């Protein structure tokens, strides 16, 4: 029940990822609307999910970090809250089986499958243009924050209170032995690893194929 396209191949630092929407409940749909797509390197995509639908994110090259946001489909003032999720799960970062909640404490996404090493990050802010300028980049550099805004706009929505706080899927941020310091490390996923989320409410999900090529977060930078 899924139509797929051939994944793009690239030797660039920022590889592409695939996302796939799989209808789990008996809902009317067309194959054209529910298919595997490729997120181009350094760009983003957004998708609307109904409660009970699944979103499968496949790391086809095994080296890509994916920044992810989610909003209540009928109220974009309600959004995925990582700080509230940490309170809910009592974990530093989400794991298989965990439910992610919104700023209104409502369940929005649950991790139902994860073939990766299970390393994801909920602490680091997404990259944005000021971040790259502070890293010494002149002019414009594609970034996850703009990718998020663009992808949601493509669906005809405007995010009322955009946040830098994204769930950084596959990102490897280690807590050091002192219990305080963090270390940014390359991702540990392998080609074909995937994570699947189940929507707990009608929602909009945005994903960015992270363009970060200054700080070593992608495993082939």
Provide a role label for each language-model segment.
Residues 1-7, 74:
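Short intrinsically disordered, low-complexity coil segments enriched in acidic
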Residues 2-4, 14-16, 20, 24-28:
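N-terminal amphipathic/hydrophobic targeting modules at extreme N-termini
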Residues 31-221:
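Acidic, Ser/Thr/Pro
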């Amino acid at each position: 029940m899924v139509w797929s396209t051939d994944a793009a191949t690239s030797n660039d630092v920022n590889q592409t990822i695939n996302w796939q929407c799989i209808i789990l409940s008996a809902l009317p749909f067309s194959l054209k609307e529910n298919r595997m797509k490729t997120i181009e390197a350094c760009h983003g995509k957004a998708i609307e999910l109904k409660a009970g639908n699944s979103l499968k994110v496949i790391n086809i090259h095994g080296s890509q970090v994916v920044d992810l946001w989610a909003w209540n489909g009928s109220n974009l003032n309600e959004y995925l809250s990582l700080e509230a999720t940490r309170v809910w799960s009592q974990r530093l970062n989400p794991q298989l089986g965990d439910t992610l909640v919104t700023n209104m404490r409502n369940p929005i996404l649950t991790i139902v499958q994860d073939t990766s090493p299970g390393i994801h990050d909920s602490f680091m802010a997404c990259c944005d243009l000021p971040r790259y300028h502070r890293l010494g980049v002149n002019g414009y550099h594609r970034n996850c924050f703009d990718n998020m805004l663009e992808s949601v706009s493509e669906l005809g929505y405007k995010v009322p209170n955009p946040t830098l706080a994204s769930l950084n899927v596959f990102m490897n941020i280690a807590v050091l032995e002192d219990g305080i310091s963090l270390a940014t490390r390359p991702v540990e996923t392998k080609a074909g690893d995937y994570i699947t989320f189940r929507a707990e409410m009608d929602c909009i999900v945005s994903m960015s194929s992270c363009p970060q090529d200054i700080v070593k977060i992608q495993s082939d930078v």
